């Protein structure tokens, strides 16, 4: 979960006044949610070679270097959203380097394959989509549900996929999603509902 919005605003204000301790606390408080956000978006082949923590460190170094630019106009974009933009650039670069190392080019028209949702997250989402209690269940049932969900998620457009990853992968509340994406809570809720409906349609074709 991303840090409290008001706490982040307070740290940003103190950082703007030149408090080094506030900058350190600001970056430290965002490290864990940033790592989870990055790990969910690494292709499995890349995740086997690159630790998400290494990318997090690179992102935070860039954030520290560019923080003064952000602080000139902090109302233009929420801090978590700014972090996510920087992180996405680093994720794309990491995929490009990985594929170049294997002598394959990165086609930007193709979405990056997200890492798998955690098993409990996949199961929770499957239960919501299929309108049934799915626990207890065998490992085989869980694996099949996860496989179907991942295939369906990969077919979503980028906006819908982001909301699903944030709500079920990062375990963010609707308020957190809204803050991270720069949306109102009502707009974030509607986007989540749309994404869930599209996933349900993919998993249950022919259902109303």
Descriptions of predicted regions:
Residues 34, 113, 119-162, 172:
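Amphipathic alpha-helical segment used for protein-protein interaction
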Residues 54-61, 77-89:
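Structural recognition of an alpha-helix C-terminal capping motif at a helix-to-coil junction
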Residues 69, 85-118, 142:
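Arg/Lys-rich amphipathic alpha helix in sigma70-family domain 2
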Residues 149, 160, 169, 174-205:
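DNA-recognition helix of helix-turn-helix
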Residues 35-38, 42, 156, 161, ...:
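Short, Lys/Arg-enriched C-terminal cap helix and immediately downstream tail that follows
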Residues 6, 17-42:
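A short, charge-rich alpha-helical start-of-domain segment used by transcription regulators
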Residues 16-17, 40-47, 58-77, 97-99:
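Sigma70-family region 2
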Residues 15, 34, 38, 55-64, ...:
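Short, small-hydrophobic-rich alpha-helical interface motif
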């Amino acid at each position: 979960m991303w840090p409290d919005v008001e706490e982040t605003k307070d740290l940003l204000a103190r950082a703007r006044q030149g408090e080094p301790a506030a900058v350190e606390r600001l970056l430290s408080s965002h490290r864990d949610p940033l790592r989870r956000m990055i790990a969910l978006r690494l292709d499995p082949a890349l995740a086997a070679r690159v630790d998400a923590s290494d990318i997090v460190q690179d992102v935070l170094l860039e954030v520290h270097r560019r923080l003064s630019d952000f602080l000139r106009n902090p109302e233009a974009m929420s801090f978590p959203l700014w972090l996510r933009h920087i992180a996405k650039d680093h994720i794309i670069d990491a995929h490009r380097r990985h594929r170049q190392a294997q002598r394959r080019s990165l086609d930007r028209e193709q979405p990056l394959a997200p890492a798998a949702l955690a098993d409990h997250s996949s199961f929770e989402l499957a239960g919501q989509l299929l309108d049934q209690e799915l626990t207890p269940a065998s490992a085989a049932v869980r694996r099949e549900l996860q496989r179907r969900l991942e295939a369906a998620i990969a077919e979503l457009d980028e906006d819908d996929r982001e909301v699903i990853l944030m709500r079920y992968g990062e375990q963010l509340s609707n308020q957190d999603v809204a803050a991270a994406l720069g949306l109102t809570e009502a707009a974030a809720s509607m986007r989540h509902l749309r994404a869930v409906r599209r996933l349900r349609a993919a998993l249950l074709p022919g259902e109303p």
